[in-house]
Amino acid sequence: MKLIAAVLAGGKSRRFGEDKLLFEINGKPLILHTIDRLEKCNLIKRVVIVASSHNEKVMREFGYEVIVDELEIGPISGLYSALSLGEVLVVGGDMPSLIPEFIDYIIKEFNNSRKIACVPRWSNGYLEPLHAAYSREFREILGERIRKGKYKLGDAIREIPNVCYISIEKLPVEWRESFFNVNRKEDLHIIT
């Protein structure tokens, strides 16, 4: 089954100094580099941008469906908003090095596992929750956590038993570049 790709675009870009998703690299905004990679995936049915109220208008100009994260409390509320559409593969808008084969692999594992979430995990336990697939039923869990003021997405994932974890160290080494995200202008040399 193909999934919706939800691109989180509501961050504040504090370390970058300006809206990094609009920063042009090779004549194109950073977020479009991320979306281009997603559009090369075989198991993505459509791309949706999850924007904040302050950047909704500019995100709509890219021609993709946009939903607004009304809560704006971080990735947890962006994912919560995206899950209103159904099952999603979620990524950050600042991930221009996504590997389409890896994204398809995550979706296949998610479909085969029939679990609430399918999340890449490093051997030290660190999760990659913004490079993962989630079922709609995870939305209820996130909603409860948000109501309780618990905003850490990684904690929400760790607290549910029904998760498919993908061991990153067992995957092709070159797939690891898929996790790269731009935080500072110095990071741009990697993709230019």
Curated annotation (Swiss-Prot):
Domain notes: The N-terminal domain determines nucleotide recognition and specific binding, while the C-terminal domain determines the specific binding to the target protein.
rRNA processing recorded as keyword: no
Organism annotation: Pyrococcus horikoshii (strain ATCC 700860 / DSM 12428 / JCM 9974 / NBRC 100139 / OT-3)
Entry keyword set: Cytoplasm, GTP-binding, Magnesium, Metal-binding, Molybdenum cofactor biosynthesis, Nucleotide-binding, Transferase
Family note: Belongs to the MobA family.
Gene it is expressed from: mobA
EC code: 2.7.7.77
Function as written in the Swiss-Prot or TrEMBL entry: Transfers a GMP moiety from GTP to Mo-molybdopterin (Mo-MPT) cofactor (Moco or molybdenum cofactor) to form Mo-molybdopterin guanine dinucleotide (Mo-MGD) cofactor.
UniProt cross-references to InterPro entries, sorted A to Z: MobA-like_NTP_Trfase (IPR025877), Molybde_CF_guanTrfase (IPR013482), Nucleotide-diphossugar_trans (IPR029044)
GO terms for MF: GTP binding; metal ion binding; molybdenum cofactor guanylyltransferase activity
Any GO BP: Mo-molybdopterin cofactor biosynthetic process
Cellular component, GO annotation: cytoplasm
SUPFAM superfamilies assigned to the protein according to its UniProt record, in alphabetical order: Nucleotide-diphospho-sugar transferases (SSF53448)
Catalytic activity: Mo-molybdopterin + GTP + H(+) = Mo-molybdopterin guanine dinucleotide + diphosphate
UniProt name for this protein: Probable molybdenum cofactor guanylyltransferase
Localization per record: Cytoplasm
Coiled-coil positions: none
